[in-house]
Design a protein with these regions (language model features):
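Structural motif
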Residues: 8-14, 53-57, 78-80, 116-121, ...
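Short, well-ordered, mixed-charge alpha-helical segments that flank or form enzyme active sites
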Residues: 18-22, 63-67, 201
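Short, conserved micro-motifs enriched in small and acidic residues
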Residues: 27, 31, 62, 166-174
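Accessory alpha-helical/coil subdomains and C-terminal extensions
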Residues: 30-148
Length: 227
């Protein structure tokens, strides 16, 4: 944005694991981060299954819950804590306490149905980001509330590493190619994105001003299927 305003021809690419850039359906790095988180949670599930535990896993998501939502659904989490799940006027601490109670209630419901192990996926905005509590603190408090042996794990920056998936490599190549083509034409002040499978570009200032919401179909699953 600053370089474009200074008159330097610039074309931006949407590169973030959070998938929270509104001008594009998909951001480079999101699929890789989701797969890293999913594989880690799958491995954590192996140990909680054999020891009849609950695992609370904190994933990245400071302002948007894309990783938590999609990874939580993909791994069959019993509860998913999203940054977007905040009531009007609610402080981060109040949200944390409310979500903690909701988790405990969900686990008790599962116990009554005969479940012996649980996975909970929490975005960092719910816990550590706002210095409300660590995921380990939450696990200890949930254990006291439910009597279920509960462990907390923060995946942290492993979500920013790893070998890129095919989807990320192809997305980066398609968008990068498009960026080079418009720069060769002397066009700048643009951001490249993907909409409905098509690569396109738009004004960089307009793109930065846009807001992106979580997809309603996945939110409907989150609300009604009982994750």
């Amino acid at each position: 944005g600053d370089l474009s305003r200074a008159g330097i021809p610039c074309v931006g690419l949407p590169g973030t694991i959070d998938n929270d850039i509104a001008c594009t359906d998909y951001t480079i790095g999101f699929d890789t981060a989701m797969n890293v988180a999913m594989e880690a949670i799958d491995k954590i599930r192996d140990t909680i299954t054999s020891h009849h535990r609950c695992a609370i896993v904190e994933v990245m998501g400071a302002r948007a819950g894309w990783i938590a939502l999609e990874v939580g659904i993909a791994t069959g989490a019993s509860y998913i804590g999203l940054p977007e799940n905040i009531l009007p006027g609610e402080t981060p601490k109040e949200r944390y306490e409310r979500i903690k109670v909701e988790i405990a209630e969900r686990l008790k419901e599962g116990q009554e149905k005969g479940r012996k192990n649980f996975t909970v996926v929490i975005a960092e905005a719910v816990t550590s980001l706002n210095h409300v509590a660590t995921v380990e603190d939450m696990a200890h408090e949930i254990m006291e509330m439910t009597g279920i042996d509960t462990r907390g794990t923060c995946l942290g920056h492993i979500q920013r590493g790893g070998s890129p998936t095919v989807r990320d490599r192809i997305a980066a190549t398609r968008m990068g190619y498009h960026a080079v083509q418009i720069l060769k034409k002397g066009i700048g002040n643009r951001v490249v994105g993907e909409k409905n499978g098509t690569v396109y570009d738009m004004d960089i200032q307009e793109a930065l001003a846009m807001k992106k919401s979580l997809p309603e179909d996945l939110l409907d699953i989150w609300r009604k299927v009982g994750y």
